């Protein structure tokens, strides 16, 4: 059984009730590939999670953009994994580069978050990626391997983990890794998993690409053998997100 294509839409800190209604309408009315071909998850801000979940067509799942590293309590402003489970939110994004860079989340902290979220029954989109400076110094694989290692040291079961490779220099910049650049890192990550976790985990774990994915470049990226889908930012707020979802058909063509 091949790896099912996975498309995540990260709305980040965007949206009003009117805008959310419009995005949900686009998603509900769009012609999208069947769930046999693609798994689709959208991640609105916390405040919109319940309404989006209740209004979206059932084929599209929802994810939180973050959760706390342990059980809830006196952690003002945080949302716990248990709360998400209570709301029947199946997925969470963890380790996004914006949280790593702006909020100082370390590899170890992200690894702890992933382990705790999984322990509570959530599925995790775990983000890794390098900065422009790190890429230019030739340390891309060292960086993403260290980020992945911090996760692998803390979990035993990878069944509910999707790894999102997001080159930081290509997020929101309009720059995009070439399909060959994306494939190179995805292949490197898969080889790392094979060597450090298991061949089975390497073969079955989906590694998706996140970095200025658009309707214009998605098919070329999707055609690469180790690109198992996308984590989409700005384009997930627009009608072209439907085209990105449907790029999954490239795999089954």
UniProtKB/Swiss-Prot annotation:
The active site is at 96 (electrophile), 166 (proton acceptor). Keywords: Cytoplasm, Gluconeogenesis, Glycolysis, Isomerase. Its EC number is 5.3.1.1. It comes from the Eukaryota. GO terms for biological process: gluconeogenesis; glyceraldehyde-3-phosphate biosynthetic process; glycerol catabolic process; glycolytic process. Homodimer. This is Triosephosphate isomerase, cytosolic. It comes from Oryza sativa subsp. japonica. The gene is TPI.
